[in-house]
């Protein structure tokens, strides 16, 4: 029952990707809430890039699931061939100058290096493209998690817990599980750092 839904989503993505120097990508794209610094003096904040790892990761995982479902169901058609080509030639996750997974198509300086969003790590969680079987990306994901830090709202901490669990770091996972249970005072109207939101 899910295959027709996958197929229509894949059809949309196949028609939406464009060729870039690094491979196929959804373009242009933004990364949730975080900006990058641009210009000679790095004072200009921009949000739109040629592509983002987050959007590409979502497409990669969709294509991966669609192709796997087709193999299981014994379905192969013209769209299957297009999906295979795009999947094989998608812009891959890249590692930046600080050893982190790049959020955008270039190694732009983040406006907020400690931003609570980790959308560039979609292939770590909930995706399945960054694992111990991809050691360079796996370590770059760890570096990204450490660079962003542990602070965040409840939902952000939940994502970090799941990502640290995928890194098989029980100590860090446990630390964040304790943090997510941190009491947020009801008088506070907004608390973005200690499990609130």
Predicted regions located by residue number:
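Active-site core of glycosidic bond-cleaving carbohydrate-active enzymes
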Residues: 1-4, 53-197
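Acidic/histidine-rich catalytic neighborhood
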Residues: 8-69
């Amino acid at each position: 029952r899910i295959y027709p839904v996958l197929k229509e989503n894949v059809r949309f993505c196949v028609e939406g990707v464009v060729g870039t120097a690094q491979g196929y990508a959804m373009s242009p794209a933004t990364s949730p809430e975080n900006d990058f610094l641009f210009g000679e003096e790095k004072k200009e904040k921009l949000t739109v890039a040629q592509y983002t790892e987050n959007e590409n990761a979502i497409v990669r995982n969709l294509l991966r699931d669609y192709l796997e479902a087709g193999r299981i169901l014994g379905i192969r058609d013209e769209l299957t061939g297009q999906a295979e080509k795009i999947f094989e030639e998608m812009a891959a996750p890249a590692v930046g100058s600080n050893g982190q997974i790049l959020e955008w198509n270039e190694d732009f300086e983040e406006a907020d290096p400690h931003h609570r969003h980790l959308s560039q790590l979609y292939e770590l969680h909930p995706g399945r493209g960054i694992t111990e079987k991809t050691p360079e990306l796996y370590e770059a994901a760890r570096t990204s998690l450490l660079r962003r830090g542990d602070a965040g709202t409840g939902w952000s901490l939940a994502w970090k817990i799941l990502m640290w669990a995928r890194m098989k770091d029980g100590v860090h996972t446990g630390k964040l599980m304790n943090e997510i249970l941190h009491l947020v005072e009801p008088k506070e109207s907004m608390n973005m750092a200690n499990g609130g939101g």
